[in-house]
Design a protein with these regions (language model features):
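Core alpha/beta catalytic barrel or barrel-like domain that forms the active/cofactor pocket
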Residues: 70-80, 108-114, 176-179
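A generic, well-ordered mixed alpha/beta core segment in the N-terminal half of proteins
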Residues: 81, 85-142
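Short beta-strand segments at enzyme active-site cores
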Residues: 37, 108-110, 217
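Acidic, glycine/proline-rich low-complexity segments that act as flexible tails and inter-domain linkers
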Residues: 1-88, 103
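Conserved active-site and cofactor/substrate-binding residues in soluble primary-metabolism enzymes
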Residues: 1-2, 15-23, 32-40, 50-57, ...
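Glycine-rich anion-binding loops and their surrounding alpha/beta cores
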Residues: 9, 64-67, 89, 104, ...
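Hydrophobic pocket-lining residues that define ligand/cofactor binding sites across diverse proteins
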Residues: 45, 100, 208
């Protein structure tokens, strides 16, 4: 891959093809990009804004190089937020997952350590004494006996270990915040997503339609990636997803 040519195109505000961003992600997992190049890539795309095809390509790359999780469960949901809203709230999506599981619905929660916030889903789960695992038998037992399973992203998405420190060092959220919600290795049939702004809502509508799952997307107009009581909020959904 000609990384210099890729950067020149990004500097000219050109969009990359889905297959190109997939190859970029795979190159990152192979260690073919150094930290400076990865930081430059994250910054360039953040400044221009990511397209639907680019986001799907990065998703393809993460799933292609990651560890799949074929859960032995008919139907389950993931509840997640993009993060990066700078509101410093507690982990609302993670909390909601336990409420949903308590109500009798199966949940496959996918998350990671904090990148742009104080506490990520994995920080919360770990601090409550849960040991992360990639053992499929244990994961299946968790979702079928407890109604919820937690999938720590770094055990399944190899790319995360290459970008984690860089994301933490950058003073702004990157497209990896947008990738997080759509790279659950168990590929849930339904997802409830909180986004920080209406541009993200429109982006994910197109992404989910191409992925082909039932979904609900929520956004508070004052910038929370949750349904908030601090002001009006918007909800969009498709399929059998109910909000």
């Amino acid at each position: 891959m000609d990384i210099k040519a890729i950067f020149n195109r990004l500097l000219n505000h050109e969009e990359l093809k889905r297959e190109e961003t997939k190859e970029l992600l795979i190159a990152i997992t192979r260690g073919e990009l150094n930290d400076a190049e990865i930081a430059a890539l994250l910054t360039a795309i953040q400044m221009r804004g990511i397209s639907v095809e680019e986001l799907l390509g990065f998703r393809d790359g993460i799933l292609a190089t990651g560890v799949p999780v074929p859960l032995d469960c008919d139907r389950y949901i993931d509840v997640v937020g993009t993060g990066g809203d700078r509101k410093n709230t507690f982990n609302i999506s993670t909390t909601a997952c336990f409420v949903i599981a308590g109500a009798g619905y199966k949940v496959a929660k996918h998350g990671n350590y904090a990148a742009t916030s104080v506490s990520g889903a994995s920080n919360v789960i770990k601090n409550h004494g849960v040991n992360f695992t990639a053992d499929l038998d244990k994961l299946n037992r968790s979702i079928n006996e407890c109604g919820i399973v937690y999938l720590h992203a770094q055990l399944f998405a190899k790319a995360m270990k290459f970008v984690g420190a860089i994301r933490k060092a950058l003073p702004f959220p990157t497209f990896f915040n947008l990738l997080g919600p759509i790279i659950n290795p168990s590929k849930p049939q339904c997802q409830l997503l909180g986004v920080a702004n209406l541009d993200q809502m429109r982006l994910y509508q197109q992404v989910y339609q191409k992925i082909g799952i039932d979904y609900g997307i929520v956004n508070s107009i004052d910038g929370y990636d949750e349904i908030s009581l601090t002001g009006p909020f918007k909800v969009t959904k498709i399929g059998r997803a109910h909000v």
